Amino acid sequence: MGNNVVVLGTQWGDEGKGKIVDLLTEDAKYVVRYQGGHNAGHTLVIDGEKTVLHLIPSGILRDNVKCVIGNGVVLSPEALLKEMKPLEERGIPVRERLFISEACPLILPYHVAMDQAREIARGKKAIGTTGRGIGPAYEDKVARRGLRVGDLFDMEAFAEKLKEVMEYHNFQLVNFYKAEPVSYEAVLEEAKGYAELLTSMVIDVTDELDAARKRGDKIMFEGAQGTLLDIDHGTYPYVTSSNTTAGGVAAGSGFGPRHIGYILGIAKAYCTRVGAGPFPTELYDGLEKQDPVGKHLGTVGHEFGATTGRLRRTGWFDAVAMRRAIQINSVSGFCLTKLDVLDGLEELKICTGYKMEDGSVLEVSPMAAEAFEKATPIYETMPGWSENTFGAKSLDALPQAALNYIKRIEELTGVPVDIISTGPDRNETIIKVHPFEA
């Protein structure tokens, strides 16, 4: 059972999943993406060299790891090919090790146009999407009008389907959003090129993963974004368009849920959020909220989105929201990242409850964004530490105050912290329990 591990974010994304996936894939044969698209940014630092991946699983930097993009991922062929190029220029074999489900919905130029037109139309009520066509592509999938990777291999049928769906989208773009239409001929010509370039990588992902499981190969499933951005369980409508939770693994890859052995939840030692939406423990947003501790977290933590480059909002660790993430994902253990960012703070706060307008106190976060926005955090204060934890590789190297902070998080959430990250490099990590050995 321990052969198959899920790594996912338990906050609002940007928790540091890429580094941990890269670290743990030393023991894996497969790394699988099961949801999202190129709106996710995973940053890896290996021997000081920085790599940012958006679509390709983080295991691509490990020579013997096969990387899989499951059917739950919305695939932009343009973005994928752009991402492959610099990796191949560095001598990393991508085509031989990257496999794509034929059932992946395609992101095409009209999805991007629709995404951006909608955000402009929303004005101050904008959700804060990346503008990369993710939501509209998922919409087409659910409406059963979407084009999929497998459609590229019958170009005559593809052209007919494309014409129909583009008439639908262009009508909305022109008549409702007062935007420019997207050229059918240009999109079709692009698609012909994609078919030729992607063919060799397309496989039956479900069959491949089942065969790997039967051989005893270790499989890692790499989540994108975070639990609180899940389309069903997040702070709706300020969410992404896919299931970012553990339940998304089976649906987004075709891998049977009974075969998942360990679920690793990734959480920062504090909280961040990009874009709009409620954030009860928020300290700093660069605009209205200018708390110096929040600014410290953003500056020292280099809190800028890997995909958007946008400044992340920062705040204290939220055990209330974490309890909800644990319920949804049945988290086996945590990896606490960016512990070193807290170095030098005299005191730390952990949110232990939400006080609501009616005077009630919630110990588990509510579902709706409206309720989130009315929550006042109840804090527990703990002493900080002045010692340097950056790059620590053992518990003995951590000050007692840091150990106390970690222990308190375990007590408040009821889940053990099995891994602690103390820097961006893969070796700046303390592993108490290895997920593949749990």
From Swiss-Prot:
Give the note describing cofactor binding and stoichiometry.
Binds 1 Mg(2+) ion per subunit.
Residues that bind Mg(2+), according to the entry? D14, G41
Summary of the function given for this chain in its UniProt record: Plays an important role in the de novo pathway of purine nucleotide biosynthesis. Catalyzes the first committed step in the biosynthesis of AMP from IMP.
Q: Residues that bind IMP, according to the entry?
A: D14, E15, G16, K17, N39, A40, G41, H42, T130, R144, Q225, T240, R310
Q: Which SMART domains match?
A: Adenylsucc_synt
Any one Gene Ontology biological process term?
'de novo' AMP biosynthetic process
Needed cofactors? Mg(2+)
Q: What is this protein called?
A: Adenylosuccinate synthetase
Q: GO CC annotation: what is one?
A: cytoplasm
How does the annotation summarize its subunit structure? Homodimer.
Give the family, as the similarity comment puts it: Belongs to the adenylosuccinate synthetase family.
Under which main EC class is this enzyme filed?
ligase
Subcellular location(s) of the protein:
Cytoplasm
Task: Give the binding site residues for GTP.
Answer: 13-19, 41-43, 312, 338-340, 421-423
